[in-house]
C-alpha cells in the first residue's frame, strides 16, 4: 500500500502512546514508562530489522540494539536494597526449598480454568512468598501477593527462560536511549519518509462508512 494512503490519527500531540518522552522546562524530562526487553520479542525485532537507524547509516534499529547489548550487556551488582539503599545481599540465590519449587511447578502445569478465581496467595505459601526468588520475580514484573494466580502462571510460561537471569538482571536487554528516542522516532521518520500522514491532536468520535 502506498504510504500516502495511510493516515494515523493521534489524540496526543506526540507519537508513541506510553512510549512518549517529553522535555518540559518546568518538570524536566518526563517519560511515562519503559519496557524491559529480551531476545524473544520476535514481533518487535522482526519489525525493527526493517527500520533504519537514525544514527548509523546503513544499519537498522535492530542492528543498533544488537550491537549495544553485545558490547555492553545488562548486569546488576546489587539486585535489591533494604533500609534506604543498603545492599540486601541476595547474593544470586533463590532461597527456594524443595517444597517451594514443587509449588511453582504445580502452578506451571495447572489448567487455566482451575485458576480463574485464585490469587497467588492461594497457590503459594511462605516457602515461595518469603524467598528471594519471589523478591526477584515480583520486582521485575510488578506482582503483588493478591494478584491473579492465572496471570502468574502465564508469566511463568512466557518468561521461563528468564529464571537464570533474575538474580542479576542479565536476562534483560535495553535500547541506547529511552524507547521513544530509540524506537518511536526512527519508526515515525521511516513512515513519514514513505508518505504516511500523521495527524496529531486529533480525536475520532465517530466513523461513517459509505459502501458502494
Briefly describe each language-model feature range.
Residues 10, 33, 59-60, 187, ...:
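Glycine-rich, histidine-containing beta strand-loop boundary motifs that form or position
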Residues 1-23:
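Glycine-rich FAD pyrophosphate-binding loop
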Residues 2-4, 58-59, 199:
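Short helix-terminating capping/connector loops at secondary-structure junctions
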Residues 11-14, 42, 203-205, 209:
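An acidic- and aromatic-residue-enriched active-site/binding cleft used to recognize and process polar
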Residues 26-108:
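Dinucleotide-binding Rossmann-like beta1-alpha1 core, especially the glycine-rich loop
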Residues 16-18, 74-76, 144, 207-209:
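Short catalytic/ligand-binding loop motif for oxyanion handling, primarily in non-cytosolic enzymes
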Residues 102-212:
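Active-site/ligand-binding neighborhood in enzyme catalytic cores
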Amino acid at each position: 500500500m502506498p504510504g500516502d494512503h495511510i493516515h494515523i490519527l493521534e489524540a496526543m500531540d506526540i507519537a508513541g502512546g506510553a512510549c512518549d518522552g517529553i522535555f518540559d522546562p518546568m518538570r524536566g524530562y518526563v517519560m511515562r514508562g519503559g519496557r524491559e526487553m529480551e531476545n524473544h520479542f520476535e514481533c518487535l525485532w522482526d519489525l525493527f530489522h526493517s527500520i533504519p537507524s537514525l544514527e548509523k547509516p546503513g544499519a537498522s534499529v535492530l542492528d543498533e540494539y544488537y550491537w549495544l547489548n553485545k558490547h555492553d550487556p545488562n548486569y546488576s551488582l546489587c539486585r535489591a536494597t533494604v533500609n534506604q539503599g543498603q545492599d540486601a545481599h541476595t547474593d544470586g540465590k533463590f532461597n527456594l526449598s524443595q517444597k517451594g519449587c514443587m509449588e511453582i511447578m504445580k502452578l506451571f502445569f495447572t489448567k487455566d480454568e482451575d485458576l480463574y478465581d485464585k490469587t497467588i496467595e492461594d497457590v503459594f505459601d511462605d516457602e515461595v512468598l518469603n524467598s528471594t526468588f519471589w523478591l526477584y520475580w515480583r520486582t521485575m514484573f510488578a506482582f503483588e501477593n493478591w494478584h491473579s494466580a492465572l496471570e502468574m502462571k502465564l508469566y511463568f510460561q512466557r518468561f521461563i527462560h528468564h529464571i537464570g537471569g533474575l538474580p542479576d538482571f542479565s536476562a534483560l536487554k535495553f535500547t541506547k536511549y529511552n524507547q521513544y528516542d530509540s524506537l518511536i522516532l526512527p519508526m515515525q521518520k521511516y513512515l513519514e519518509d514513505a508518505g504516511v500522514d500523521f495527524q496529531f491532536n486529533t480525536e475520532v468520535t465517530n466513523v461513517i462508512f459509505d459502501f458502494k
